[in-house]
Regions:
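Short Pro/Gly-enriched coil loops immediately N-terminal to beta-strands
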Residues: 247-249
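GHKL-family ATP-binding catalytic core of two-component histidine kinases
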Residues: 70, 91-93, 125, 170, ...
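Catalytic nucleophile serine of serine hydrolases
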Residues: 81, 96, 121, 221-223
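Short alpha-helical segment within the catalytic ATP-binding CA
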Residues: 79, 127, 172
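Short, well-ordered beta-strand segments
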Residues: 75, 91, 115-117, 123, ...
Length: 249
């Protein structure tokens, strides 16, 4: 991964459409990463400039690197939906990504007993911390089925079956989840983070009514800034306070 390369692994979601693919083709070189090649692979007409095959997936020693790793080196590029125009790549550094992870650990205080639900599409920045945050403290990663985030009944079931303790919602989906929530099935929830839309007073009250023991966090940040830049912990007694975006992380 680098400033002039886009590396893709796995499939590209249908929901992204052709706009993102055409943007990639226009603005970046193509590099296909293939672990095991079949005897024949038709790549001559595929438009790839390079094909990396048969690489050792083990740890790369410092002596093997062309240049040393730096905190400002690229960690990942994530593409916006393009809902307001052409999709654009948001490049985030190693330093920004790690800073975000350590901040989340500071406020959530995760342990090996926690279980984080990964349900956000990989095309959205929230997914980055959902699957990488468990690595900070050895927490367990629980992976939802594709499109499971759209089904409140399914979410109730997986939360209860897997004892999920940390999860993220956009307020619209949080509202649907709370409306369908079975309190007895959600006793394991310690932290709910909400982002992507404004969190209103009625929804805040509903969360505390249904899940009085859960911590509710209102977080805000653009994809270009490693996901979150401000946060606010909602309190049950703040019934008349519209949750602000809060303080810098």
């Amino acid at each position: 991964v680098g400033p002039s390369f886009i590396m893709t692994t796995g499939s590209i979601e249908d929901a992204l459409g052709s706009g993102l693919l055409s943007y990639w083709e226009e603005h970046a070189a193509s590099l296909s990463s293939v672990g095991v090649l079949p005897e024949r692979l038709l790549v001559d007409d595929a438009g790839f400039r390079d094909v990396v095959s048969g690489y050792d997936a083990g740890v790369i020693a410092a002596s093997e690197r062309i240049t040393p790793l730096q905190p400002d080196h690229l960690a990942y590029v994530i593409y916006t939906s393009g809902s307001t125009g052409t999709p654009k790549g948001a490049a985030n550094s190693q330093l920004g990504t790690i800073n975000h992870m350590f901040w989340m650990q500071d406020i959530l205080q995760l342990t090996e007993e926690d279980r984080i639900l990964h349900k956000t599409s990989l095309s959205f920045d929230v997914s980055v911390w959902e699957w990488s945050l468990p690595l900070i403290e050895g927490s367990c990663l629980v992976i939802a089925t594709p499109d499971g985030h759209r089904d409140p009944v399914y979410l109730n079931r997986i939360i209860q079956e897997q004892s999920v303790s940390v999860l993220n919602f956009v307020p619209t989906m949080l509202s649907s989840f709370i409306d369908a929530a079975v309190p007895e099935a959600c006793l394991s929830i310690r932290h709910i983070l909400t982002s992507g839309e404004a969190l209103g007073i009625p929804l805040q009250e509903s969360v505390f009514e249904v899940l009085p023991d859960a911590h509710l966090w209102n977080v805000y940040g653009p994809s270009e800034a490693s996901d979150d830049v401000t946060y606010w912990r909602c309190q049950p007694e703040d019934k008349d306070l519209t949750p602000p975006i809060g303080s810098p992380i």
